[in-house]
């Protein structure tokens, strides 16, 4: 079954584990299965209509999000019927194409990592991007399916896979920022959109908005659940509230990791501890913290495959003080807040006052 986003775990998980721990065994063990999957994706262009016999006319897609066309809440249907909206079918095919591009990029990277020729997948990634621009995105950065222009997740995926550039990208970013503002600086994303939300915003110069979302307390937000007693990550943004009690009782898990992906952003961006994709296993570390006074301080330690990495920052008056440790045998590219140039640090402990 080709459930977009879920089926892609067969490619995304091996790539992620390899990058995190530096061991190619998981890539080698799964290469044949990943290659077969990608051949099927390529043959069908991951198109929902083409794959309808496998999937039925349904996708989980951006599950339990608040946007139009969401499947669980039946926004993908013509109101009062079981007829799937053509806009929803088009949306599913667009998201699938974005995963096709993402998967192909990861496959090329993994091929190179295990000594294989990456050209097949480099070419496939280029074809997927060309397909996205031909079928789904106008030259000005708007979506051909007009309802997607009112949503957050479609723009996030276009930015994630670098399908838009130049003025088209700038226009999409401006529209995305306006969308957040129109929703009171609240996210509207579900499982898939949230998985790339914070990192994509930061990579595209919108870390300020990422922090707005992190500190948001209205529904939907991470702190809404915390304010309502959560000690775990919930499946739904509004799974419970003190005012209304338990939300929808069907399929309402209170221990469901999907939205826990924000922790990756906290470690990589707030704390500034990220693996360099070019050197798996934290042998080279990207340390680029993005502080915010509302957070107050960060004290983080990560026992990586390369050793213990530390990052702790705090404010003292007008000064920002950062202490960090690069483990023995590793190196780090360090970029200070507000700067673009990085500096190479060898193993050791350091303090910077800015």
Descriptions of predicted regions:
Residues 1-5, 51-93, 140-161, 192, ...:
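Carbohydrate-binding/catalytic loop surfaces
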Residues 1-12, 29-32, 91-102, 149-153, ...:
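Aromatic- and histidine-enriched alpha-helix N-cap/loop-to-helix transition segments
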Residues 10-26, 98-116, 156-167, 196-205, ...:
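Well-ordered alpha-helical scaffold segments within catalytic/enzyme domains
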Residues 20-99, 113-156, 167, 216, ...:
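Active-site acid/base region of carbohydrate-active enzymes
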Residues 122-123, 208-354:
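Non-catalytic C-terminal accessory modules of carbohydrate-active enzymes
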Residues 146-148, 178-186, 216-223:
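Solenoid-like repeat scaffolds
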Residues 169-177, 247:
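Alpha-helical repeat scaffolds
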Residues 172-175, 203, 213:
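A glycine- and small/hydrophobic-rich beta-loop-beta segment
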């Amino acid at each position: 079954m080709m459930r977009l986003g879920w089926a892609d775990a067969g490619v995304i998980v091996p790539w992620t584990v390899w990058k995190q721990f530096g061991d190619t065994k998981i890539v080698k063990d799964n290469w044949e299965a990943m290659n077969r999957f990608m051949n099927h994706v390529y043959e069908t262009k991951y198109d929902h209509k083409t794959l309808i016999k496998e999937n039925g006319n349904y996708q989980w897609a951006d599950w339990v999000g608040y946007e139009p066309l969401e499947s669980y809440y039946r926004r993908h249907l013509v109101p009062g019927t079981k007829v799937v909206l053509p806009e929803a079918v088009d949306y599913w095919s667009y998201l699938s194409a974005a995963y096709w591009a993402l998967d192909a990029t990861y496959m090329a990277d993994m091929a190179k990592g295990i000594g294989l020729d990456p050209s097949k997948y480099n070419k496939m990634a280029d074809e997927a991007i060309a397909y996205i621009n031909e079928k789904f995105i106008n030259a000005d950065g708007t979506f051909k399916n007009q309802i997607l222009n009112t949503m957050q997740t479609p723009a996030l995926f276009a930015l994630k896979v670098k399908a838009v550039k130049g003025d088209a990208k700038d226009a999409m970013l401006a529209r995305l920022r306006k969308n957040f503002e129109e929703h009171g600086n609240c996210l509207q994303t579900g499982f898939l959109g949230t998985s790339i939300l914070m990192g994509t915003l930061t990579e595209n110069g919108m870390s300020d908005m990422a922090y707005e979302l992190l500190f948001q307390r209205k529904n939907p937000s991470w702190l809404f659940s915390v304010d309502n007693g959560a000690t775990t990550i919930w499946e739904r943004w509004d799974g419970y509230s003190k005012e209304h009690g338990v939300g929808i009782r069907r399929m309402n898990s209170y221990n469901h990791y999907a939205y826990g992906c924000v922790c990756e952003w906290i470690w990589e961006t707030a704390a500034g501890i990220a693996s360099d994709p070019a050197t798996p296993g934290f042998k080279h570390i990207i340390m680029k913290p993005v502080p915010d006074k509302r957070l107050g301080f960060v004290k983080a330690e990560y026992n990586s495959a390369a050793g213990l990495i530390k990052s702790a920052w705090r404010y003292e008056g007008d000064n920002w003080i950062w202490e960090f440790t690069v483990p023995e045998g590793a190196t780090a590219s360090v970029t200070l807040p507000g700067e673009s140039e990085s500096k190479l640090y060898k193993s050791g402990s350091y303090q910077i006052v800015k």
